[in-house]
Amino acid sequence: MKHFIKENKGLAIYSFLMVFATYGIKLFNNTYAIDTMHLMTNYRGYLKHWVSIGRPGLVALKLLTYNYVNVYFLNLLAIIFFAIATILLCYYVDLSTKQIYNKKYLYIIPSIFPTSQLFSEQFYFVLQNFEFSLGICLVILSLIAIYHIPNKIFKLFGFLLLAFTLTMYQSFFVFACTLILFKILMALYFAQLNDLKISFKDYAFKIGHFILLAISSLVLSQLMAMLAKKVLNVESSYLDNMILWGKRPLIDSINDIKDYAKELFFPQV
């Protein structure tokens, strides 16, 4: 990682500049939503609420700044760690390619990743923006440990870390799967590029490994969430308007996702 940053100082600086240009305004105002007010007035109660909806990992990170809600400080941490997450993503892509290529292509990542509209709503909430940024870092680090460090202890640590991140935000599961699939596709692409024969067994192994890693990490994260509820004696609950898979018609859930995605990507002006 140090070697990568040393060779790509311009990329690291550019990543910080893009994040600052996108969210730097948050360093100069103290606007926050009503959810943050609830946290200020009922800190313990809000942490228990997160445990009840299956987010004990988010609670664990929140304890890093326990009972301390400084809007400016949390926004600063969020921006710093989001920039670090962007650099880590560049590093992961660089490791996954394994080939000599024009390093300037890496500048595409900080140009579109931190500036994506997907994050604009999330970073409006001071309540969780620091933990969200740190969580992205942990997801990428876990996959680097699993796929790019030969030491088995690090691989095990990476697996446990990946499962832990899924107890922070369930949406990290989709993010992790996307990065894993990218790694697999790059491996297959460069094998074909070098005229290496890939058998059906090799394809099946890579896909099977992906499915096994995804399912096992998800199952372990759910066990962690259940254990946290049991230890803390907290009953399960759900967020308002949360999609309850299996308790509503599947078509209704799909339509909800389509409507939300349409509103997010194609908002009416």
Task: Label every model-predicted segment.
Residues A176-L218:
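Perimembrane helix-loop-helix junctions
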Residues M1-F20:
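Start-transfer (signal-anchor) and selected internal transmembrane alpha helices
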Residues F154-A176, L181:
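Membrane-interface alpha helices of multi-pass inner-membrane proteins
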Residues I34-T41, W50-C90, E121, E131, ...:
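Membrane-embedded glycan transfer/ligation machinery
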Residues I25-F73, I207, I211-V269:
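Membrane-lumen/periplasm interface segments of multi-pass, membrane-embedded glycan/lipid transferases
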Residues V139-F154, A187-N194:
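Membrane-interface transmembrane helices that cradle and orient dolichyl/undecaprenyl
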Residues I79-Q99, L141-A145:
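Transmembrane-helix motifs of polytopic, lipid-linked glycan transferases
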Residues R55, K104-Y147, T167-F172, A176, ...:
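Membrane-interface micro-motifs in multi-pass membrane enzymes
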